């Protein structure tokens, strides 16, 4: 009977013990910060993983206006670049202008004799890249012809006029002699000459202007020769004219000679444009020009260039992000986010990083929560936080350096005859965009994977550092927490945090407390064994008592037992 009572008391004592309720132990948990609502990013292994913070890498909107700083932006208003170069009367204001970017408006129009340029895109690109309409007149000698022809389709003020940079030559009296003119280039730069040929609408107009039934224009240099014959015939009426002028251009290198031979229909140059090599360009846009600063310009307006990618427009000028198809790419700049649970752990608010993050920790990425004789507390570990931040800082700049190539992408224009070239160019551009879009997504996924891995690694480093400090003075409780087997006040906790903890000071106390607590702190497996042993002994004692009672009753004659065979 005494044995039963002792076993019952022992079992009750085992279950009633709470080793953490005394003042001679403490609990320390390590964790990382978390936010209630994180940001989803893509990594190599996961399409969607939540992180505490992320930065958008794709610029998807413009500011709606074109900034005039740091580039000199010239508003073409009602003039195209070619009209300004030829000297259309309503574009005289642009003579001798300079620009970094010439803006052509959709409202631009020609207001002179109707013309066409067989290689319009090339001429436009050459003039645009020069960045100037600086013009130098030269003393061409045209003998036996009438100069400075004009037309009612090209009025300057109230008088008939013509393109100011061209000289329309017609008959003088009843003759149009063969013209042979040379002009050497004795300068050390390239000269751009603009000339043309007139296509009358009828044979009568041809002979009326040039005497000959068919003229011819030949322009030559040491490197090239162009011979053009007029195509006489009626064309759709434009500004009262059914004739046309075809504009051509010739570049004369230093030391070369320009030679012009013609017996009619010549629209002669008056001088040359000085060729310059630069990064100037031309762009079609209806966005307003305003006083602001932006290093990247698109037809939609200027955009910031602090992101490596943009989805605003393929056509750009300046220091611009790479164009990609994606509307969004997010670069992880924080750690993996595990929102804090409402109820957890035996200590309520104290739970380690294995279980979840801590939303209340705002002064660092990693830190400690503890419970000791002085209460509970929390503190950030600034060293591990700074180590993670140092590795993440500069990621955005590195991505920009890898992708943000400083260049300008001009518009591509092709005539109908060049349809195959246009298709090929479009295919090449689309392929480049597809390739960059894939590379961008892969690059960001790799960087995100690296960020998450390194922040996880910093958490593990802090845990291992703490474990090595505590040694046998504490036990890993799992979930990122330690049970410290000695009295550890706030100063002691602080020494663990800053790495000055000396486990030898507390070793004897910890070992003594560990043995005392381990003697009664039985884990669930041992408790089960004690329960089974206690149950078996109790049953045995009950049987012994019952058997003894029966034997005693038989001896007294109170119970009679007959055995028959």
Curated annotation (Swiss-Prot):
Q: List the disulfide bonds.
A: 29-481, 67-292, 79-91, 112-154, 296-320, 488-492
What post-translational modification information does the record give? Palmitoylated.
* Location(s) in or outside the cell: Virion membrane; Host apical cell membrane
Provide the leader sequence positions: 1-16
Q: Which UniProt keywords apply?
A: Clathrin- and caveolin-independent endocytosis of virus by host, Clathrin-mediated endocytosis of virus by host, Disulfide bond, Fusion of virus membrane with host endosomal membrane, Fusion of virus membrane with host membrane, Glycoprotein, Hemagglutinin, Host cell membrane, Host membrane, Host-virus interaction, Lipoprotein, Membrane, Palmitate, Signal, Transmembrane, Transmembrane helix, Viral attachment to host cell, Viral envelope protein, Viral penetration into host cytoplasm, Virion, Virus endocytosis by host, Virus entry into host cell
Could you tell me which Gene3D superfamilies the record lists for this protein?
Answer: 3.90.20.10, 3.90.209.20
- Give the sugar-modified residues: 23, 37, 53, 78, 180, 300, 498
What are the TM regions of this chain, as residue ranges?
530-550
Family from the record:
Belongs to the influenza viruses hemagglutinin family.
Protein name as annotated: Hemagglutinin
What organism does this protein naturally occur in?
Influenza A virus (strain A/Equine/Kentucky/1/1981)
């Amino acid at each position: 009977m005494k044995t039963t009572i002792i076993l019952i008391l022992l079992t009750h004592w085992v279950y009633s013990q709470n080793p953490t309720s005394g003042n001679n132990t403490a609990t320390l948990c390590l964790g990382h910060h978390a936010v209630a609502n994180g940001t989803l990013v893509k990594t190599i292994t996961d399409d969607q993983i939540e992180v505490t913070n992320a930065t958008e890498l794709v610029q998807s909107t413009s500011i709606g206006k074109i900034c005039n700083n740091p580039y000199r932006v010239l508003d073409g208003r009602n003039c195209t670049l070619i009209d300004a170069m030829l000297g259309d009367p309503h574009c005289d204001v642009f003579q001798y202008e300079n620009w970094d970017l010439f803006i052509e408006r959709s409202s631009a129009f020609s207001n002179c004799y109707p013309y066409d340029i067989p290689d319009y895109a090339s001429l436009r690109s050459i003039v645009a890249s020069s960045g100037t309409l600086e013009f130098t007149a030269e003393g061409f000698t045209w003998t036996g012809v009438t100069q400075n022809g004009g037309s009612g389709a090209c009025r300057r003020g109230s008088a008939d006029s013509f393109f100011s940079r061209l000289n329309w030559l017609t008959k003088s009296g009843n003759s149009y002699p063969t013209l042979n003119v040379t002009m050497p280039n004795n300068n050390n730069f390239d000269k751009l000459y603009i000339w043309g040929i007139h296509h009358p609408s009828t044979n009568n107009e041809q002979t009326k202007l040039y005497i000959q039934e068919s003229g011819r224009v030949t322009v030559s240099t040491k490197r090239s020769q162009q011979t053009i014959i007029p195509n006489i015939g009626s064309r759709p009426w434009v500004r009262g004219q059914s004739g046309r002028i075809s504009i051509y251009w010739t570049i004369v290198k230093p030391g070369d000679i320009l030679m012009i031979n013609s017996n009619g229909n010549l629209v002669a140059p008056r001088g040359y444009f000085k060729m310059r090599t630069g990064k100037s360009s031309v762009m079609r846009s209806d966005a307003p020009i305003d006083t602001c600063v932006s290093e990247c310009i698109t037809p939609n307006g200027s955009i910031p260039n602090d992101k490596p990618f943009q989805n605003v427009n393929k056509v750009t000028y300046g220091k611009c992000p790479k164009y990609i198809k994606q509307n969004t790419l997010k670069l992880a700049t924080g750690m993996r986010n595990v929102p804090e649970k409402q109820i957890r752990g035996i200590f309520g608010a104290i739970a380690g990083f294995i279980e979840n993050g801590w939303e209340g920790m705002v002064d660092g990425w990693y830190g400690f929560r503890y419970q000791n004789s002085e209460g509970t507390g929390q503190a950030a570990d600034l060293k591990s936080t700074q180590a993670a931040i140092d590795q993440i800082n500069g990621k955005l700049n590195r991505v920009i350096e890898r992708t943000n190539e400083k260049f300008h992408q001009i518009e591509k224009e092709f005539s109908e005859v060049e349809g195959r070239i246009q298709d090929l160019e479009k295919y090449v551009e689309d392929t480049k965009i597809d390739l960059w879009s894939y590379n961008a997504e892969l690059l960001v996924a790799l960087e995100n994977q690296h960020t998450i891995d390194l922040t996880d690694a910093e958490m593990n480093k802090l845990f291992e550092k703490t474990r090595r400090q505590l040694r046998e003075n504490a036990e890993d409780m799992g979930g990122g927490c330690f049970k410290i087997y000695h009295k550890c006040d706030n100063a002691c906790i602080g020494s663990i945090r800053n790495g000055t903890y000396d486990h030898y000071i507390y070793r004897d106390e910890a070992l003594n407390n560990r043995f005392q607590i381990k003697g009664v702190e039985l884990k669930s497996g041992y408790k089960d064994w004690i329960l089974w042993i206690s149950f078996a002994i109790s049953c045995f004692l009950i049987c012994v008592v019952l058997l003894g009672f029966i034997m005693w009753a038989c001896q007294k004659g109170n119970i009679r037992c007959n055995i028959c065979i």
